[in-house]
């Protein structure tokens, strides 16, 4: 993400590593986004009681790889590769950065392809923000939100409708990207975060993704599920077995809106039975 300000009230919960070249000038603005995203992962439910998921608080290892709104995706993907190799103990990684340009209908972006390879080789999962609209003429999601192995999250309003800033999939015209949707803040109800100078009300897919990272981390690190099963559990909870969304709805919402409460994800309804079956198919 962008940089992190260690002076905030939850600073002790975050292990911070600044990966940006010291020769580059850093402004106060560069610390806002990264600090806000961390506040959701660490203490989101206290800041937003209506989004209390029952997952508790999380420790964060934060790597500052970008400053301002302009950054080189090549440099960042190279750094991500290095970071993952040196932090094998972390299974869930949140990426709330993305390109303004639209993805291509005919191939996966270079950044997404690299992230897919990293996930496969290291047995980890990325949670990626579905990218925001920089202007009205940009409609499709931007890289790396076309990463197939990642959990891509789009944003909805408190009422469960698509936000003004959300962009749409699909990836390669048939992969459901985004995978799911979650609450990212809007005029009806913004997301409360903690920035370096205090509390702020924000909106964006960047602020929907960390909530899903919390849930994935709970399923993987607390309940001990593997990443494929954890991802499948969230997708399954987002969409009822008898729902049949149109391709347009899938392009905007993915498989649906993930329930707020963790209990609604791990517990089944009275008239349902859920089996978790997983294995690796050998040749």
Q: At which residue positions do the language-model features occur?
A:
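Extracellular S/T/G-rich loop segment that most often corresponds to the catalytic His/Ser-adjacent loop
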Residues: 1-5, 9, 140-217
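Subtilisin-like serine protease catalytic core
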Residues: 2-18, 23-73, 121-123, 147-149, ...
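Flexible loop/turn segments at secondary-structure boundaries
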Residues: 5-7, 69-70, 100-104, 134-137, ...
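Secondary-structure boundary elements
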Residues: 6, 47, 85-90, 117-125, ...
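Short secondary-structure boundary/capping segments
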Residues: 11-17, 75-79, 109-113, 140-144, ...
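Predominant activation on well-ordered alpha-helical scaffold segments within soluble catalytic domains
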Residues: 38-42, 112, 116, 181, ...
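Substrate-binding/access-modulating region of protease and related hydrolase catalytic domains
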Residues: 65-145, 201-203, 207-208
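C-terminal subdomain of the subtilisin-like protease fold in secreted/lumenal serine endopeptidases
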Residues: 221-283
């Amino acid at each position: 993400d962008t940089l992190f300000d260690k002076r905030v009230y939850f600073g002790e919960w975050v292990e911070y590593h600044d990966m940006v070249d010291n020769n580059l000038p850093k402004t106060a603005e560069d610390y806002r986004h990264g600090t806000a995203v961390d506040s959701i992962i660490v203490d989101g439910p206290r800041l937003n009681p209506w989004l209390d998921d029952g997952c508790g608080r999380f420790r964060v290892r934060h790597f500052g790889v970008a400053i301002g709104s302009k950054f080189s995706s090549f440099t960042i993907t190279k750094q991500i590769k290095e970071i993952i190799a040196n932090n094998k103990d972390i299974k869930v990684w949140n990426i709330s950065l993305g390109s303004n340009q639209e993805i291509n209908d005919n191939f996966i972006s270079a950044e997404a392809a690299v992230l897919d390879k990293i996930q496969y080789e290291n047995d980890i999962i990325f949670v990626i923000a579905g990218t925001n609209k920089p202007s009205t003429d940009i409609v499709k999601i931007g890289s790396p939100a076309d990463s197939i192995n990642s959990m891509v999250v789009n944003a909805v309003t408190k009422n469960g409708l698509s936000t003004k800033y959300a962009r749409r999939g699909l990836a390669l015209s048939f992969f459901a990207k985004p995978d799911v949707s979650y609450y990212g803040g809007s005029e009806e109800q913004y997301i409360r975060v903690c920035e370096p100078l205090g509390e702020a009300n924000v909106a964006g897919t960047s602020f929907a993704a960390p909530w899903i990272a919390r849930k994935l981390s709970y399923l993987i690190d607390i309940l001990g599920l593997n990443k494929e099963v954890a991802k499948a559990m969230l997708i399954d909870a987002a969409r009822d077995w008898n729902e049949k969304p149109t391709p347009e709805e899938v392009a905007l919402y993915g498989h649906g809106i993930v329930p707020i409460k963790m209990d609604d994800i791990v517990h089944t309804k009275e008239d349902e039975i859920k089996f978790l079956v997983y294995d690796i198919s050998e040749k």
